[in-house]
Amino acid sequence: MNYYEEIKNKLVDNEITKKIKDYSKNKSDLDTYYYVGKMLSEAGKHYGEGIIKEYSNKLTYDLNKKYSVRTLYNMRLYFEKICCNEKLQPVAAILSWSHYCELLRINNMHEILYYINICKQYNLSKRELITKIKNKEYERLPKESKLKL
């Protein structure tokens, strides 16, 4: 399997889909980033961690668009942290990609689930989510409330 060609083709397909179906942009993005994250996770197991940097350079050159190491790393984290987690999987497509990029910095899965749920419940913007994370809202919850999540 040629991981690079698979990733490149998926990203090109995603760019086409974005132009045709703007209304489903977020779903298309998350599906694509899930797939690319999965491919990067598998490629990393075969070729090592440096593959993300290599693919970033190649994708930026081939597609004339900036696919930074950080962006590709976030795609892999989205797949590994969110989509592969049984508790988080059912809610994986609820938020925008920018929301997930903020949540990927959190290591505690219960905390991520808490923030996903409040974003959904209160329709929080990315900026509002960042404020709640900076204010450590989850950490200030009583222990009993955390256990119910």
Question: Model-flagged regions — what are they?
Answer:
Residues 1-149:
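Basic, low-complexity intrinsically disordered segments
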